[in-house]
């Protein structure tokens, strides 16, 4: 059975009156699922399913047969052809124009000599041409590898050792020039921020970027192997053959970069297939997340991790939304982006949300009315979020007219982005729970989880251990790292390396990293995040983290880094000395 995912996306709004849940977006709460006897083990009970439509778990497991990710995206682009695909600094790119751009880039890449199953590294952030190139590579059966932005020269060389072509943002050229000047690269496409801008902004930005490049000695050399976007597109004239390749099962679709926390082993490229990437779309639709046709999504983070690639590009464009593409990332810039563009969907880090709501408070203090009624799916990664701050931010959203809360979630590249996120119903229940850490939502339908101890035994509700995930979105493996792959994947379960607990409602709580600990003299383990959470429970503390500093005699010293609230009055140095 194949599903019309786009239609499912609006199912809940169209049928909302049938379900006695007035004025609520999201999935219906199927409390009758609780009538069965609970075993005490989450992987068996799957208590989170009560927050979803009755058949959501099975529907989310359906697969798209013989389709690539570009196939399903193109179908959606055609279906919602009248909705703008991308807004980039006031320039609007229509869905038909986006499709044309993808096919043009597909011919250009073929004209350069990019072959089927070839891996093409991409270093930089999202721009309109990067969206098109990503889809074009999928169309021709090649694989984009979104490189981690912070890597050593050695890691760059290892991760790109099998590649003949690369794509680089000129603003980051200095970071990679030693690697991408290597003779093995046949062509390196240079992307600039000005490529898709309207005149005269395009010319102005190009001029100032050139001046900055001279000052910083970061200009890309003028050599035949380095080609700019306009020149690269002309390569399409040299290819007149078929660009679309036949579907191949389990073909590499994307390689994203792991955050590096899931397993030891340095830089890791995480391989997603067409099947696993499409499975994420199925799961998101059956989770009832608030990505609605015609709405806007702020796309500001680079596609290095699958969370950005999926949640800020593939999913919104597939669901008929408009991408607001602004690649500038800063605390002050994020607030401006949000206020000017009014995106319905936004996903960013805790520090950026903190800066955003701090600005909201300042505006309210000045007597200004702040309108956040357009918010529908604003998401924060839950790790390390101070529960007191999270509560305050949600109160601010409600005060400013938002009908939905700030949602928390959890994801990793090894499951191609999202594992869990709050729904409207589950978030209402989660807000009633007192805990040193916030809930990061409930698992997506079609996903199973379990919490295990060091021996791999599943733990009961409320007990803490490593989170394991089983999902059709799971990675194929780490790029050219079979030994690490075998450690991360065990009998279909993905090891996260993160300490979690799950309650009887199926809500997940992320405590911290499994290796964020010290061994006490009595051989007991102490998690450093527990100490930090204890400090953060103080009303005078905004944030805290604790690390272990090695001493010369082989012992360690624990050091707490504390950020006090601006309102705190007292001796900050003395406050925690005796404790």
Annotate each PLM feature.
Residues 94-96, 244-246, 253-279:
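Conserved AMP-binding A3 loop
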Residues 88-92, 106-151, 300-302:
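Conserved AMP-binding/adenylate-forming
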Residues 2-93, 97-112, 195-220, 242-246, ...:
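N-lobe entry segment of adenylate-forming
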Residues 149-181, 197, 280-298, 330-344:
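Conserved ATP-dependent adenylate/AMP-binding module captured primarily in the ANL superfamily
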Residues 141, 278-296, 304-347, 354-366:
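Conserved AMP-binding/adenylation subdomain of ANL enzymes
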Residues 471, 476-477, 499-579:
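AMP-binding/adenylate-forming catalytic core of the ANL superfamily
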Residues 188, 203-207, 219, 227, ...:
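Gly/Ser/Thr-rich phosphate-binding loop
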Residues 425-428, 436-446, 457-487, 507, ...:
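Conserved ATP/PPi-binding loop(s) of AMP-dependent carboxylate-activating enzymes
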């Amino acid at each position: 059975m194949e599903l019309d995912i786009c239609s499912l996306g609006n199912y809940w709004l169209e049928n909302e009156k049938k379900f006695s849940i007035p004025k609520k977006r999201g999935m219906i709460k199927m409390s009758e699922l609780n009538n069965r006897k609970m075993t005490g083990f989450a992987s068996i009970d799957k208590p989170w399913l009560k927050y979803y439509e009755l058949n959501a778990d099975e529907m989310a497991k359906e697969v798209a047969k013989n389709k690539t990710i570009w196939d399903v995206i193109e179908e959606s682009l055609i279906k919602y052809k009248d909705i703008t695909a991308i807004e980039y600094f006031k320039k609007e790119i229509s869905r038909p124009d986006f499709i044309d751009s993808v096919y043009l880039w597909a011919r250009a890449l073929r004209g350069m000599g990019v072959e089927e199953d070839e891996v093409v590294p991409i270093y930089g952030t999202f721009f309109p041409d990067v969206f098109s190139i990503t889809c074009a590579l999928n169309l021709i059966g090649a694989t984009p590898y979104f490189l981690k932005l912070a890597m050593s020269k050695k890691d760059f060389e290892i991760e790109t050792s099998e590649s003949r072509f690369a794509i680089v943002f000129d603003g980051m050229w200095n970071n990679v020039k030693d690697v991408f000047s290597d003779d093995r690269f046949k062509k390196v496409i240079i992307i600039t921020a000005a490529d898709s801008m309207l005149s005269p902004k395009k010319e102005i930005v190009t001029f100032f970027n050139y001046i900055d490049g001279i000052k910083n000695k970061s200009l890309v050399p003028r050599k035949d192997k380095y080609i700019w976007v306009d020149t690269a597109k002309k390569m399409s004239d040299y290819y007149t053959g078929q660009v679309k390749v036949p579907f191949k099962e389990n073909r590499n679709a994307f390689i994203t970069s792991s955050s590096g926390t899931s397993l030891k082993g340095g830089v890791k490229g995480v391989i997603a297939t067409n099947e696993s990437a499409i499975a994420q779309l199925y799961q998101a639709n059956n989770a009832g997340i608030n990505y609605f046709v015609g709405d806007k999504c702020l796309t500001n983070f680079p596609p290095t991790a699958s969370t950005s690639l999926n949640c800020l590009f593939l999913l919104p464009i597939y669901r008929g939304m408009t991408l607001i593409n602004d690649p500038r990332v800063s605390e002050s810039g994020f607030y401006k982006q949000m206020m000017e563009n009014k995106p319905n969907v936004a996903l960013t880090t805790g520090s950026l949300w903190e800066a955003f709501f701090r600005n909201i408070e300042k505006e309210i203090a000045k007597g200004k009315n702040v309108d956040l009624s357009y918010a529908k799916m604003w998401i924060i990664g839950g790790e390390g979020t101070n529960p007191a701050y999270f509560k305050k931010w949600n109160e601010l959203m409600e005060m400013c007219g938002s009908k939905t809360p700030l949602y928390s979630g959890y994801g990793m590249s090894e499951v191609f982005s999202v594992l869990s996120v709050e729904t409207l119903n589950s978030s209402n229940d989660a807000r009633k729970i007192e805990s040193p850490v916030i809930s990061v939502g409930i698992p997506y339908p079609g996903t199973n989880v379990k919490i295990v101890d060091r021996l791999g035994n599943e733990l009961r509700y409320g007990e803490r251990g490593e989170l394991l995930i089983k999902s059709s979105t799971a990675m194929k493996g780490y790029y050219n790292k079979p030994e690490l792959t075998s450690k991360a994947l065990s009998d279909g379960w993905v090891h996260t390396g993160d300490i979690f607990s799950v309650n009887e409602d199926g809500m997940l709580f992320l405590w911290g990293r499994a290796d964020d600990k010290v061994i006490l003299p009595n051989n007991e383990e102490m998690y450093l995040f527990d100490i930090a959470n204890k400090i953060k429970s103080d009303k005078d503390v905004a944030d805290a983290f604790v690390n272990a500093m090695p001493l010369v005699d082989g012992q360690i010293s624990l050091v707490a880094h504390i950020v006090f609230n601006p309102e705190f009055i007292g001796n900050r140095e003395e406050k925690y000395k005796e404790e």
